[in-house]
Amino acid sequence: VIQNAKREIYMEIWSQDFKFFEKELLNAYNRNVEIRIVGYDNFNSRFGLVFEHAFGRDIELSLGGRMIIIAADDSEGIVGKISSLKNDISDTNIIWTKNKGIVFIIKEFIVHDMYLIDVEENLVEQMKYIYGKGFKRLKDKVLGSNATYMIH
């Protein structure tokens, strides 16, 4: 997917998984492919535009793994979960697709996270006032107050 990209790559990835993609992403960046990343868990990159997701640990605990999400040139995508259990990959599931409709949804998911991260970073006090600490009121509204699924 990364090697095939000509214009843009959008991705969401945890810092410990980034090392497996960094060389190819740097090659793409050096080919003038725009790289936009939502990074989790103290993420750091020397290239591309990075949005740091603040709830990486919570999401990983809730899912039992780390998401990997990539959209390239509106034509190819990857989405899945990498298991947190070091010796058990049975819960690791990743799909690759060239279905443009699915790639569109993958990219929209990433872009949506980027918008929210930027808003959260710039309106910290307002968000806390409106939604409470950790966005509790928003999570309760969207997911229900008894939800066990706490992805954000």
Task: Map each language-model feature to its residues.
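Interdomain hinge/linker segments and adjacent boundary elements that couple functional modules
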Residues: V1-M11
